Swiss-Prot record:
Protein name in UniProt: Non-structural protein 3
Region described as Interaction with host EIF4G1: spans on this chain: 208-313
HAMAP family: ROTA_A_NSP3, ROTA_NSP3
Organism this protein belongs to: Rotavirus A (strain RVA/Cow/United States/WC3/1981/G6P7[5]) (RV-A)
Region (RNA-binding): 1-149
GO MF assignments: RNA binding
Length: 313
């Protein structure tokens, strides 16, 4: 049965594309900074670092494993998907994830990235406007959740009394972001649905191709059986022909030496391989014609010695 590994191939393609994007980003940065570089050296170093990070962090194996689970589910095998679902809902998994998060937090603190910086980076992102010196500050999902839970406060100590502050309608902003999120979610779902349909079509084409191959193999087997039957029939016919010639030879009034010579030639015929048998028959017929020619020459010489003439009618 043919296996569909489209998701694994797509995940591998995304990883390779990410590596190529990393190389392009590195070389573009060096060019903008006016730094001369060797492309092969940059390519080798980025590749070494990229492969090490992807392998050491387990990200590559994690992506390929999830892709393999999706392929198995598309092929009707839901065991791996069920195990992953149970694993994600296990309390031990949750505890281990919390432990990993705590380790990452401590690592960031040891690098000088304190809690304030981590929270701000998690709540906001900055988007540069092309051709402008200003920037757009975007709120993340965490910021939206904090607003909903009432965990956002305004410190008036940083605002002067005479300063006019523009009121931001966070509700409308949130509704706009929610609409954008729903629109993006719909587009992603449409693309995923389209990809699943294409994957199913590819799978159907594979099954159809497999059926065609099976039919061709069956036809080849039938032709092989027919060829084997023809070969057996030829072997039987050749064996019967040799036996018939031997019986006819014994009924002739020829000297025993001639009979023995012809019988030896008949026994040397390969009745197993029809091609060799035809070659042996050709050799036998040539020898008979040659003997007949020699007898005729002897008879012709004898007639001349006796002063006789011969004619063909």
């Amino acid at each position: 049965m043919l296996k569909m590994e489209s998701t694994q191939q797509m995940a591998s393609s995304i990883i390779n594309t990410s590596f190529e994007a990393a190389v392009v980003a590195a070389t573009s940065t060096l060019e903008l900074m006016g730094i001369q570089y060797d492309y092969n050296e940059v390519y080798t170093r980025v590749k070494s670092k990229f492969e090490y990070v992807m392998d050491d962090s387990g990200v590559k194996n994690n992506l390929l494993g999830k892709a393999a689970t999706i392929d198995q589910a598309l092929n009707g095998k839901f065991g791996s998907a069920a195990r992953n679902r149970n694993w994600m809902a296990d309390t031990r998994t949750t505890a281990r994830l919390d432990e990993d998060v705590n380790k990452l937090r401590m690592m960031l603190s040891s690098k000088g990235i304190d809690q304030k910086m981590r929270v701000l980076n998690a709540c906001f992102s900055v988007k540069r406007a092309p051709g402008k010196s200003s920037s757009i500050i975007k709120c993340t999902r965490l910021m939206r959740d904090k607003i909903e839970r009432g965990e956002v406060e305004v410190d008036d100590s940083f605002v002067e009394e005479k300063m006019e502050v523009d009121t931001i309608d966070w509700k409308s902003r949130y509704e706009q972001l929610e609409k954008r999120f729903e629109s993006l979610k719909q587009r992603v779902n449409e693309k995923y649905t389209s990809w699943v349909q294409k994957a199913k079509k590819v799978n159907e084409n594979m099954y159809s191709l497999q059926n065609v191959i099976s039919q061709q193999q069956s036809q080849i087997a039938d032709l092989q059986n027919y060829c084997n039957k023809l070969e057996v029939d030829l072997q039987n016919k050749i064996s019967s022909l040799v036996s018939s010639v031997e019986w006819y030879l014994k009924s002739m009034e020829l000297p025993d030496e001639i009979k023995t010579d012809i019988e030896q030639q008949l026994n040397s015929i390969d009745v197993i391989n029809p091609i060799n048998a035809i070659d042996d028959f050709e050799s036998l017929i040539r020898n008979i014609i040659l003997d007949y020619d020699r007898i005729f020459l002897m008879f012709k010489g004898l007639m001349r010695q006796c002063n006789y003439e011969y004619t063909y009618e």
